Amino acid sequence: MSGDYEDDLCRRALILVSDLCARVRDADTNDRCQEFNDRIRGYPRGPDADISVSLLSVIVTFCGIVLLGVSLFVSWKLCWVPWRDKGGSAVGGGPLRKDLGPGVGLAGLVGGGGHHLAAGLGGHPLLGGPHHHAHAAHHPPFAELLEPGSLGGSDTPEPSYLDMDSYPEAAAAAVAAGVKPSQTSPELPSEGGAGSGLLLLPPSGGGLPSAQSHQQVTSLAPTTRYPALPRPLTQQTLTSQPDPSSEERPPALPLPLPGGEEKAKLIGQIKPELYQGTGPGGRRSGGGPGSGEAGTGAPCGRISFALRYLYGSDQLVVRILQALDLPAKDSNGFSDPYVKIYLLPDRKKKFQTKVHRKTLNPVFNETFQFSVPLAELAQRKLHFSVYDFDRFSRHDLIGQVVLDNLLELAEQPPDRPLWRDIVEGGSEKADLGELNFSLCYLPTAGRLTVTIIKASNLKAMDLTGFSDPYVKASLISEGRRLKKRKTSIKKNTLNPTYNEALVFDVAPESVENVGLSIAVVDYDCIGHNEVIGVCRVGPDAADPHGREHWAEMLANPRKPVEHWHQLVEEKTVTSFTKGSKGLSEKENSE
């Protein structure tokens, strides 16, 4: 009853208030009465509706701004980044100069690999200057190469070259002398236009020519571009034809041909050494002592470097400068070259340059040091191996160079870098690196401990010239994997140090029937991990060194036995044990 009474009382109160509001004069304009009437009739409140509309407009505006930002970001990624990347050079990766055209000279070939021509022509008397001045413009003295912080390949300014358009005095003198541009100059990379005219100039001594003379010289350049393919040279194109009416003018640049009947057959091929200036005693800068190239294969370009021996610290300093005219190993017409350096006969210690993408004329400018006593330097040889980097298969060997007489070469003037032909080598055994680990077996506990110590000289699997290696050890029995253990990942290194123990439980009665497969794997954030190399130890391992290590472990229980093992390619090892079926493809990939 109390509930009904209260409800009835509330209804009566509402009716009373409604009557009072109805009798009040100007009740429609009274805020309280209007609010009360709206509540009685169920109408929404005005301020609440305004707040809802304002909140909705704010949400819509915010969503529009977010969508606009997302659309701008997607447009930038899809349009601006590819357009910007198209501006890169097809050879050296640098920006393509828009002002290069058919009428430019060698100055247009910035980083294009044609500076071996300018360096060779700079030492000829027709160009009015000694040879070493031309080389000094390209390579600074060796003292500057050994400044603090220079190790590791600091960048040097790009070399400049002879540009006929930039020297109207010499161009006018060439036109007056009747010198014609060589239409069959050696192939130059197409960064600035491979068909630029190369003029052989007499000694300059005239005044400034007029603008008309400058225009005449630039019009002599060929109007067509030549593809970057070797084309035969004839004896006529190797020399320039001066005006026969002038007897006092010196003859054209004499470029000597290779001697001997066999070398005479190579006249129709490009020979970069013909354009190198002559050194002391008439010896060309590309030849001389210590030019013992590896093998007698066909030349695969040229490599430039500088040597110096530090007597105080017994250090042989080697600076890799650049390479020219490398062969194309990829389907896109380029290569991804890098250089490995050994000081023979020791092949365990090696250095490697960075990988240069999509170029046939890489500029390295990287310095390395070998510790070698002066008494041993005469018996040591410097070995350069030029490789083409391949992300998904074995790296291709482009060629190699072997140098002896290192002390004599190190005493060459520092401002004159050495040039050598890169000779095509035979199939070189894949150098995947070495792994150092120890084995220890506890018979009473039935525990086999594999301590991964370190690895050295691993194969570079990333474009940075490094790898992200980790070690995976698998316990194998009758060709089946029973257990596996892994080490941690070491980032950006080819010589990782682990010092990590991997423990396996092996019963004493089973130790004669099991073995280990140890693989060094390169970790990839995107895609599958790649095996760098493997080594296998056990009583029936195919490698004799693996069998010896296992037998020594069993002969010395409770003592760690440490050995170095050479890594081999996984596909070359068909089975872990002789006569076993081997690991399945799925197990190997895990």
From Swiss-Prot:
The keyword Flavoprotein does not apply. This is Synaptotagmin-3. InterPro entries: C2_dom, C2_domain_sf, Synaptotagmin. The chain crosses the membrane at residues 55-75. Ca(2+) 4 binds at D462, D468, D522, D524. Ca(2+) 1 binds at D330, D336, D388, F389, D390. It is found in: Cell membrane; Cytoplasmic vesicle, Secretory vesicle membrane. Its main location: membrane. GO terms for molecular function: calcium ion sensor activity; calcium-dependent phospholipid binding; metal ion binding; SNARE binding. SMART domains: C2. Homodimer; disulfide-linked via the cysteine motif. Can also form heterodimers with SYT6, SYT9 and SYT10. The gene is SYT3. One of its GO terms (cellular component) is plasma membrane. PROSITE patterns: C2 (PS50004). Keywords: Calcium, Cell membrane, Cytoplasmic vesicle, Differentiation, Disulfide bond, Membrane, Metal-binding, Methylation, Repeat, Transmembrane, Transmembrane helix. Binds 3 Ca(2+) ions per subunit. The ions are bound to the C2 domains. Ca(2+) 3 binds at D390, S393, D396. Ca(2+) 2 binds at D330, D388, D390, D396. The modification Omega-N-methylarginine is found at R284. Disulfide bonds: none annotated.
